[in-house]
């Protein structure tokens, strides 16, 4: 007992000594107080870390959190907007991405939480075409006429993000209340492009009686209620794999243009991706009507081919084509499009200035050479950097159904095969003498095009009889056009007059009917003129004021007069260097170049 008391006393004295020592920790706290302080600070730091992490994760996953947006007009360019928000690094429609049918709240949330840049959603009115129909815009694609998401709720959520907006209207009754909502939202700033889409015309594989959105009412409401948008007027389309060649026709495209040409807004035309290549002559014409126009390629269940997509890209301005295409095709397409020095998939009816890209865009800087036989062709393919190859075509003496190169026995097919196998930039100029050879030659071109080999500018020339020129033995202009359109229309038309008709030069009686005839064609047209006949007339000036028309001056090699037609030829150059071309010998070309430099 005593021992215990002594020990207890010793312990008590020790604790007292330690307590005195503890008071010296930082000169303020006891050990217990210091430990408690450290634990408390640690808990506070841990709580801050957890809180900040939670806020960051929620902000990232909850698309309803407001994003600060710089001011941007709702009718502004979509690519400019994506550049401004940092979504893309260059102004190229290839890099814009889309989310389809972001209609229900769950799909909308999924779209907002994704990395896509533009949300596309369908708008109708609640209970459309039923006794329960209201004027409340909802997000639903037919046959759905009810939704858990109204347009107002959709806009409230989407406008807190930095996504672009495309609204696809399924009925005219949804348009007015939707535009009222957009106008109201814009009071505080939509700050992103808004695209307004509706199918207003029947398109490929769709009968005329099929219901579409009334175009006149659609456009009138936009101008009245909320004109600050990009308009996306489309065709109602049905793609059928059993009819793969059905496409947008000339009449469909011209009808669309006549319907929208009065609109002041930016216009983007939605085009089915599987039908775009075959309809390209008409679609490219539509694009050429205004710099405000663009195309948006979209797809259904079937995937477009990479070759078809590359064809569209290689024949258009990258700022004017959008690709609403699904993965994995979109990524594959992007990779293929970025390959340097890949062969260009040029449209054979395209502009040779665009193909050859000569210095100063001057047609004189495009080289022309004539193919006389196999040896001359091989020499040109080996030694020349590229240019237009003039190929005179006639019938084989023993085989009238086999077109050959005039002056040799080389079949035209063999000639074309060698040209198409070359990696150099070549244009094809077929100089055809008879109607039979026209059909056979066009058939060879069609075959090459169908197997995806013909990616060269291709011109078809014939002396034709038309207007004041009625000379026995020559094909009529109307029959020439019909034959080309029937067999292979994807060419530049290069008609010329029989030499017997040029005694008085190119008179108005000759030229004006020819221009009128070919003005009806949808292809590019280059009228062929003989240099020695030019000085007898200046009627050629009529041609260069026509859209899609150009002039090609030919100088016969047997004519040694270097100054033949030179005055008119220089006048043609002065009028338009991009739309005047020169199928002339090297000596004559150098002479013109020298004269041009002096001037």
UniProtKB/Swiss-Prot annotation:
Pfam families: Menorin (PF10223)
GO CC annotations on file: extracellular space; membrane
Cellular compartments annotated: Membrane
Predominant location: membrane
Domain of life: Eukaryota
InterPro entries tied to this protein: Memorin (IPR019356)
Annotated TM spans: 39-59
Membrane topology: Single-pass membrane protein
UniProt keyword list: Membrane, Transmembrane, Transmembrane helix
Family: Belongs to the menorin family.
Protein name: Protein FAM151A
Originating organism: Danio rerio
Lineage, top ranks: Eukaryota, Metazoa, Chordata, Craniata, Vertebrata
